[in-house]
Amino acid sequence: MTTVTKHKVLLIAGPTAVGKTALSLALAKQLNGEIISGDSMQVYRHLDIGTAKIMPEEQAGIPHHLIDIKNIDQRFTVAEFVSRTTALIIDISARGKLPIIVGGTGFYLQSLLAGYQFGPADNEPDMAYRQAWFDRAAVEGSDVAWMALKQRDPQAATAIAPANLVRVVRALEYVHTTGQLFSEQADTHGDTLDAYTLCLTAERALLYTRINQRVDQMVAAGLEQEARWLFDQGGAMLPAGKGIGYHEWFPYFNGEQTRDESIAKIKQDSRRYAKRQLTWFRNKMSVDWINLLEHPELRASIDQRLASWLS
């Protein structure tokens, strides 16, 4: 029997403005780690302020990956994230270091942990198909998805527990998008990661206050000029132009709203995004929640949890 090597991977997740960067730097130093960005916008060159990108002088000598790897006219798909991150995990682990993935793009993180497979013609997952099964299972129970898999790929159904809805839906989606049996493809990725996910959180009023303050700091640091540059390159027509903190400026640049209205919209969109992030991590992923902003004394408990996981 072939023994599959399990790679330890630490994920630090959570909404924007909750303190992920500071914790990741501290833990990377403590655990001899390297950091992989799990943020879908930090891949873009020249977009530093609006993405809250950690700059080289702030990285404290810790290697950071998946930052500044794309031009603003290039797409960064979940398939590419999974592929690149998997390769980085293997490389970092082989060098005796701990991969630490930091970010708030929940779908990307979930896809990595669940081991979603993306064929060459399937550059993006079928989100509508996947969500339809999650919605149906929420009403009828997870067995309904498993029974469908049993009809389409009995061997896969035998190998997957009915209660493991994420994996069942992954198998159904694979059959749906490729026309091939899930049981016949090498689906080992999800079994090669020994992942531990810390999700930072905070009481909503405090989180929203921090988000508003962060936006003000970004504006003071030159966010408007950064957004103007992006607008002049093509703005909303570019993949990078859809990011929060950027697209809200475009109506102002077109003379359709005021500067203050643009800033208020960035704050509103950022708060709504934080709410969606928390909902995603709560409903779609298995995480350990911790509120360090209001309870810094819990920092010691993180060390205890990690020591147990790493032992």
Swiss-Prot record:
Q: What name does the UniProt record give this protein?
A: tRNA dimethylallyltransferase
- Sites binding ATP sit at G14, P15, T16, A17, V18, G19, K20, T21
- Cofactor needs: Mg(2+)
Name of the encoding gene: miaA
Tell me the function of this protein: Catalyzes the transfer of a dimethylallyl group onto the adenine at position 37 in tRNAs that read codons beginning with uridine, leading to the formation of N6-(dimethylallyl)adenosine (i(6)A).
Region (Interaction with substrate tRNA) spans which residues? 39-42
Quickly give the catalysed reaction: adenosine(37) in tRNA + dimethylallyl diphosphate = N(6)-dimethylallyladenosine(37) in tRNA + diphosphate
List the disulfide bonds in this chain.
none
Protein family per UniProt: Belongs to the IPP transferase family.
This enzyme's EC code(s)? 2.5.1.75
